[in-house]
């Protein structure tokens, strides 16, 4: 019995002296839900970066880009986020003013987007143009302009996203303001008759559309490429409007917390190269903003090209966003 006790003690002593398994360094990325879905870029981006960094990537999802910024403001300096991925240029002035983001410190030579957007904090990773996407089997004669969309048949419904939580919803708000100016409130009143519902994020809206709940949805000119490549159908189409289509440039940035984690800067640099950019066209269904190692899928050649690009300067969006959201609320709640 005494011998057994001695052997047992010796075994625990050896275990206690054995070196603990080395825990991998972790990078926490806040992003939107469609990015981390099984069909989104997240899984492949995670796999590619983890091979390069020998680390663990932890994605934390919110409904959409505006919700990401709102969450970070609530968490403040106590946030667990090293990187926030999914903001866009419409939010940069407000995000910078929060004081929760740090300069990227990376070379952005490979980054190229319409308008040559450059920023010391916010790094573009993709871009696209907002568009009305429609089901050609249910709607053979869709609205051919924003004016026709606003003033058309109320029986032909569209699903939109909330500008308070979703960057596409904010994009639609700014699209309407770009075209209608001071008459945007009146235009929203007319359009409201066609709105089936307003969802918190893009995923919910597009899901309702593909389930047949509505023949139209606010999405991107690139969205039909998914259906062409994956589903082998050209049933779903996007529209380029003569008034122009509103541009979205999606961005990522490291937080002030993340700036203390060397993996954050490493990820931002990785994001501008093929390991990230090659994943974007056929998972996020947007145009890549950085260096790729292969051409775009052939389906992208069939997509409509905007006749005019619309984009309100970030400082003007920051100055007026609350006012314009209230205008939308007042017009659509009547």
UniProtKB/Swiss-Prot annotation:
It is found in: Periplasm. Residues 1-23 form the signal peptide. Thiamine binds at residues 64-65, 166-167, 202, 220-223. GO terms for cellular component: outer membrane-bounded periplasmic space. One of its GO terms (biological process) is thiamine transport. It comes from the Bacteria. Keywords: Periplasm, Signal, Transport. GO terms for molecular function: thiamine binding; thiamine pyrophosphate binding. The keyword Transport applies. SUPFAM superfamilies: Periplasmic binding protein-like II. InterPro entries: SBP, ThiB, ThiB-like. Its main location: periplasm. It holds the Pfam family SBP_bac_1. The complex is composed of two ATP-binding proteins (ThiQ), two transmembrane proteins (ThiP) and a solute-binding protein (ThiB). Part of the ABC transporter complex ThiBPQ involved in thiamine import. Belongs to the bacterial solute-binding protein 1 family. This is Thiamine-binding periplasmic protein. It comes from Brucella suis biovar 1 (strain 1330). The lineage of its organism: Bacteria, Pseudomonadati, Pseudomonadota, Alphaproteobacteria, Hyphomicrobiales.
């Amino acid at each position: 019995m005494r011998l057994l006790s001695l052997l047992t003690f010796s075994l625990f002593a050896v275990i206690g002296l054995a070196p603990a398994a080395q825990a991998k360094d972790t990078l926490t990325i806040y992003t939107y839900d469609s990015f981390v879905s099984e069909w989104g870029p997240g899984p492949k981006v995670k796999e590619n970066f983890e091979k390069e960094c020998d680390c663990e990537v932890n994605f934390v999802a919110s409904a959409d880009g505006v919700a990401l910024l709102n969450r970070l403001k609530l968490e403040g300096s106590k946030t667990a986020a090293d990187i926030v991925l999914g903001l866009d240029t419409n939010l940069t002035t407000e995000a910078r003013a929060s004081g929760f983001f740090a300069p990227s410190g990376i070379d952005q030579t490979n980054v190229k987007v319409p308008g040559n957007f450059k920023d010391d904090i916010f790094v573009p990773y993709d871009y696209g143009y907002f568009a009305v996407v429609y089901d050609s089997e249910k709607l053979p004669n869709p609205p051919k302009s924003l004016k026709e969309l606003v003033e058309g048949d109320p029986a032909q419904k569209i699903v939109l996203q909330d500008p308070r939580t979703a960057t596409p919803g904010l994009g639609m708000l700014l699209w309407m303001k770009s075209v209608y100016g001071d008459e945007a409130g009146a235009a929203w009143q007319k359009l409201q008759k066609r709105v089936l519902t307003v969802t918190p994020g893009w995923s919910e809206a597009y899901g309702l559309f593909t389930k047949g709940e509505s023949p139209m949805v606010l999405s991107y000119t690139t969205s039909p490429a998914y259906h062409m490549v994956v589903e082998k159908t050209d049933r779903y189409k996007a529209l380029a409007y003569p008034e122009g289509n509103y541009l979205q440039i999606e961005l990522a940035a490291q937080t002030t917390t993340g700036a203390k984690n060397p993996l954050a800067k490493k990820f931002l640099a990785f994001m501008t190269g093929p390991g990230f950019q090659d994943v974007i066209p056929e998972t996020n269904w947007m145009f890549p903003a950085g260096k790729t190692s292969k051409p775009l899928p052939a389906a992208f050649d069939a997509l409509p090209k905007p006749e005019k690009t619309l984009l309100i300067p970030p400082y003007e969006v920051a100055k007026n966003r609350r006012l314009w959201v209230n205008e939308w609320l007042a017009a659509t709640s009547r």
